[in-house]
């Protein structure tokens, strides 16, 4: 009975974590470039009542007798399927087609990665920044990309090349390029908030994509499917309720045992 109670507690903890992840997914259903999370479980250790025995000449083999001791959290994964693309007709809104991440530099000089392509001009110097003011960087992740404030016009090509006509006309400047980065294991990236990811020991080192595909005038939406999340929420809620029932039932049995002696 104590085993069943502890199994119920482990199940409740797991389904609470699942509900936490589902809640975060739903909260970010309209967040640009957001990638949803997924929770998986695995069983805990099993207590062995008796071991397995092989067959003999006079009797057959016997399978092991084991009692499971509950469930545990196996993983919280980030699902990197692409979100739908929303047209904005704004040239600094950039959507990545396929794999890849923009690289931005925070005030401390750290390189972070994002799929959210809503960029803006720094009015002071024409640098391209994200909503937090982090600089979009190009080749080598060192130099902030810049379009002079007095440029007559500009465009961003599908390969990331930035083209602009300087003030007063003249030759089109194409010296800057947005580089998309990729990882051998994107699932190993660490979320740091603000639609940003950080390289980790298990993500592999960022490498430059050879054939980047960028769509100017569009944004990648969240890949959260509300109908799927609501279904998972119902399943998690019922799972939580079922585990509470295990605890209350075990408690009732213990109460009966206590009442045997009056």
Regions found by a protein language model. Give the residues of each.
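Amphipathic alpha-helical polymerization modules
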Residues: 1-142, 146-262
């Amino acid at each position: 009975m104590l085993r069943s109670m502890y199994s119920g507690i482990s199940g409740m903890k797991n389904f609470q974590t699942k509900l936490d992840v589902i809640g975060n997914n739903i909260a970010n259903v309209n967040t640009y470039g957001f990638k949803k999370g997924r929770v998986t479980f695995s069983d805990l250790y099993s207590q062995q009542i008796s071991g397995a025995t092989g067959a003999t000449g006079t009797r057959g083999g016997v399978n092991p007798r084991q009692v499971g001791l509950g469930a545990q959290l196996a993983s919280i994964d980030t699902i990197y399927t692409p979100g739908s693309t929303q047209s904005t007709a704004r040239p600094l809104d950039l959507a990545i087609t396929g794999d890849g991440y923009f690289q931005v530099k925070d005030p401390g000089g750290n390189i972070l990665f994002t799929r959210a392509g809503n960029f803006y001009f720094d009015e002071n110097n024409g640098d391209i920044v994200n909503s937090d003011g982090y600089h979009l960087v190009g080749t080598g992740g060192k130099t902030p990309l810049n379009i002079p404030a007095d440029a007559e016009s500009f465009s961003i090509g599908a390969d990331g090349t930035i083209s602009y006509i300087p003030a007063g006309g003249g030759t089109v400047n194409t010296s800057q390029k947005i580089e998309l980065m990729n990882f051998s294991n994107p699932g190993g990236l660490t979320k740091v908030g603000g639609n940003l990811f950080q390289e980790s020991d298990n993500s592999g080192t960022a490498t430059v994509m050879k054939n980047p595909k960028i769509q100017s005038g569009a944004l990648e939406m969240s890949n959260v499917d509300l109908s799927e999340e609501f279904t998972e929420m119902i399943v998690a809620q019922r799972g939580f309720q079922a585990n509470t029932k295990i605890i209350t039932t075990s408690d009732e049995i213990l109460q009966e045992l206590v009442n045997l002696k009056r």
